[in-house]
Amino acid sequence: MAVTAGTGSSNSGGFYSFGSAGSAERALGSVASGSTGTINYALALTNNTGAALTSFTLSYDGEQWRNGGVTATHSLTLQYGFGASYAGVAWTTAGAGFDFASVMNSTTAGLVDGNAAGKVAGLGGTVATNWAAGDTLWVRWTDIDNTGGDHGLAIDNVSMSFTAAAVPEPSTYAMLLAGLGAVGFLARRRRA
């Protein structure tokens, strides 16, 4: 499916690069309407650090660029999972703090300024995981085809960071070995 530049004025289903007319500042979004069915946009990241990662922190801004003319709240739901390919992922919902819910829900259909009235900044949080070196993490936002008109929802300013498993300093190993040696010495001394 192609990505179409739009301001939120169209109710045609599909992927959109939403933004104000003539602006280079854009957000990746969708209108899951008509024949599109559910729309997913995904990001694949491979852990090439050489170490296990114990968590990831994700933040983004949710933006609504179109009011579909319905009073129902529509959402982008964030899910994640691990797998070599998109088709092989067992998806896990990250939690409510990661989801974006539409903010303009009225019977008047039309465009919404996603950088102002339609914006919810700072969504996301931290997810504990066991992300092995070499594994691929998939993150996706899901926009379902709701009954009636669909709102135009988008993501912008996506940021991710990761936490590696703690690796003991060499001095920690030296102290551990010295401590074990002292315990062994004391045990031998008591026997004598």
Q: What does each of the following model-derived ranges do?
A:
Residues 1-51:
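Surface-exposed, low-complexity/disordered Ser/Thr/Gly/Pro/Asn-rich loops and linkers
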Residues 4-6, 71, 86:
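His/Asp/Glu-rich, glycine-adjacent segments
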Residues 50, 63, 81-164:
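Terminal, low-complexity interaction segments
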Residues 63-73:
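Extended, low-complexity, turn-rich repeat/linker tracts enriched in Gly/Pro/Ser/Thr and Asp/Glu
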Residues 77-79:
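Beta-strand signatures of extracellular beta-sandwich domains
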Residues 169-187:
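A short, hydrophobic C-terminal helix/tail in secreted or cell-surface proteins
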Residues 189-192:
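Short, charged juxtamembrane terminal tails flanking transmembrane helices
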